[in-house]
Amino acid sequence: MSLVPATNYIYTPLNQLKGGTIVNVYGVVKFFKPPYLSKGTDYCSVVTIVDQTNVKLTCLLFSGNYEALPIIYKNGDIVRFHRLKIQVYKKETQGITSSGFASLTFEGTLGAPIIPRTSSKYFNFTTEDHKMVETLRVWASTHMSPSWTLLKLCDVQPMQYFDLTCQLLGKAEVDGASFLLKVWDGTRTPFPSWRVLIQDLVLEGDLSHIHRLQNLTIDILVYDNHVHVARSLKVGSFLRIYSLHTKLQSMNSENQTMLSLEFHLHGGTSYGRGIRVLPETNSDVDQLKKDLESANLTANHHSDVICQSEPDDSFPSSGSVSLYEVERCQQLSATILTDHQYLERTPLCAILKQKAPQQYRIRAKLRSYKPRRLFQSVKLHCPKCHLLQEVPREGDLDIILQDGATKTPDVKLQNTALYDSKIWTTKNQKGRKVAVHFVKNNGILPLSNECLLLIEGGTLSEICKLSNKFNSVIPVRSGHEDLELLDLSAPFLIQGTIHHYGCKQCSSLRSIQNLNSLVDKTSWIPSSVAEVLGIVPLQYVFVMTFTLDDGTGVLEAYLMDSDKFFQIPASEVLMDDDLQKSMDMIMDMFCPPGIKIDAYPWLECFIKSYNVTNGTDNQICYQIFDTTVAEDVI
C-alpha cells in the first residue's frame, strides 16, 4: 500500500445525505456483518455507521472480491467510504456501493496508531483525514459504549451470544453442514467445555499440542454458510468469531450428573454472525499473544471433564446431527412473529390430527415452495368477494389500451371545469388522435408532480412515459355525456410503475366528474380515487404454497400477503429488479439450492387451519399469518 497525491475530498455529514447522490462519508461502526457470500458470486457486508450528528446510516456493500469490502474487526472501528451511493428504501436512507467505491478502516481506540486497513495498493490519506479519525475517536469515546459482546472464555455464561478473539489450534470437517474448530484464548471456561467425538474425523492440527492444552481449549461447531469459511482457515491463525452461542448441557455419567458448556456458531448472518481472520499486527491480537504466553499450560487436567461417552450429549460418531435436534444446535429463526407470542409451539404431527378451525405456533423448515418462478406468485385479490386473478401481462394490457384508442376523442367533452385538454395527432399511425386532460386544483393547473392526467387514445408506451413525468394517469374514453373509465381489465389509475386495478364484480362505476369531490387534488391516494369512482380496488398479493417439515410431519401451508411477510410490497416487485433480487435471496436463504435440508434455517410461523368444501369433499387447509421475514436475515 502507498499514498497517492493528495486530492481534496468533501465529506458529507450523515444528517445531510440525500437520495440519488454519491458521497464520501466518515463514521463510527455501530453494527456490521463480516463479508459473506451472497446469491451468485458477490460478497456482501452490512455496515451501520454513526457520526457526530447522531444520525445512523446502514450500508449494503457488494463486491466480487472479499478483500475489497471494509476490513472491520469490531464495533467502534472508524470507516471512510468514498463514492457511496445514497438511496431511500422503505422510507429509510441507506448507502450502497457504486462504481469506484473504496474504503479505509481504522481502529477506534484512543491512542492507537492510525493505520489504514485496505486491500487497495494506492489510497489518499491527508493530515485532514488524520484529524477526522482523531476527532471521531474522541467523540465515540464519550458517546458510544464499549462493545460488551467481546468476552474472554473465563467470562462467558450459558445461553449467551458473544464475540470471541482466539487462536485456532485444530479443525475437522464433521459433515457438509457443520465443521469443528478447536480454539483457545489463554483462559478457562467457568464450566467444563464439551468435547466433540472425533474418532471418525480427520483432525488437522498438532494433536500433542492440543492434548497439552485440553483444559484451555474449547470445541466450536459452526454450521451452514460458515462451513466454507472454516475450511479455509489456517491452524495457528488468530480469529474473531462473532455471535458465538453458549449452552449448558447436563450429562449423566456413572450415577452422577455433570454440566458442560457447548459452543455453536449458527447458520445465517443475523446479528453479525461470522468469522474473521485477524492480522498479527492487530492490537487485540497483541494482547491475546501475551495472554497465551502467560497461560498456565500445566493447569490441573483433572478439573475438566471430557464429554465423549454419552451419545445423547456428545457429537455422534457418524458425524451428523439429527435435523431436528432443535434445542441443541438450531440457528435463530429466519422469520419472526408479529403477534400471539403467548402461544406454545405445536408439532406438525399433532396439528395434522386436529380439526379446524384452529391457530398454531410452529417451528419448521421449508422443504419446498410453489411457484418456483417467483414473479408468478404475484396476484390481484379482491378484499370484498375474495376473487383472485392474474396480473395482466404487458402484451394483454397493450391490446386493451389499443382497443380503447380506436374511438376518436369527443371535442364536446374537452376543457371543462374539472380539466384542461390538449389534443395531438400521431404520425404514421393513420392520424390517431390522443387527448390529454389535465385535472385542475381549484381551477388552477398544479405542478407535474401533483397533476392527474386523464388520457384518451394513448398506447401503453405513451401512458408509461406520462406516468413517469406526472403524479398519476387514468386511461379514459369518451362516453355519451362524460369521459368514462375503460373496461376494468385496464388499470383505473397508474402511478409511476404501479398499476391499480378494480374488481369487475364488486365495482359500480361512477362519473369521472366525481373527482371534483376530492378535497386533496395533489396526492391522488388510490383508495380515495377508487371510492369516488365507485371502484372496489384489487390488492396486489403474494400467493405461495410452502411445504413445511419439522421432523414430526409435513404440512402444506398457504401464504397470501401484500407486504408484511417479505417486507417487500407485492405492488412494486414486478417492475423493480432490485426487489425481485431481494425476494430471490430470501427464498434461496429459506430453501438453499444444492444442500441438504439439515442446513436449512428454521422458520417460526403462525398458521391457522380452516375447512374447505368442494362438493361432498371436506378438506382442511392451512394459512400462514402474523409472520414476517427477520429484517437482518440477509
From Swiss-Prot:
Its main location: nucleus. It holds the Pfam family POT1PC. GO terms for molecular function: G-rich strand telomeric DNA binding; single-stranded telomeric DNA binding; telomerase inhibitor activity; telomeric DNA binding. It is found in: Nucleus; Chromosome, Telomere. It comes from the Eukaryota. InterPro entries: NA-bd_OB-fold (IPR012340), POT1 (IPR028389), POT1_C_insert (IPR048953), POT1PC (IPR032042), Telomer_end-bd_POT1/Cdc13 (IPR011564). One of its GO terms (biological process) is telomere maintenance via telomerase. One of its GO terms (cellular component) is nuclear telomere cap complex. Keywords: Chromosome, DNA-binding, Nucleus, Telomere. Coiled coil: none annotated. Homodimer or homooligomer. Component of the shelterin complex (telosome) composed of TERF1, TERF2, TINF2, TERF2IP, ACD and POT1. Binds single-stranded telomeric DNA as a monomer. Associated component of the telomerase holoenzyme complex. Found in a complex with TERF1, TINF2 and TNKS1. Interacts with TNKS1. Forms heterodimers with ACD. Identified in a complex with ACD and single-stranded telomeric DNA. Component of the telomerase ribonucleoprotein (RNP) complex that is essential for the replication of chromosome termini. Is a component of the double-stranded telomeric DNA-binding TRF1 complex which is involved in the regulation of telomere length by cis-inhibition of telomerase. Also acts as a single-stranded telomeric DNA-binding protein and thus may act as a downstream effector of the TRF1 complex and may transduce information about telomere maintenance and/or length to the telomere terminus. Belongs to the telombin family. This is Protection of telomeres protein 1. The lineage of its organism: Eukaryota, Metazoa, Chordata, Craniata, Vertebrata. The gene is POT1.
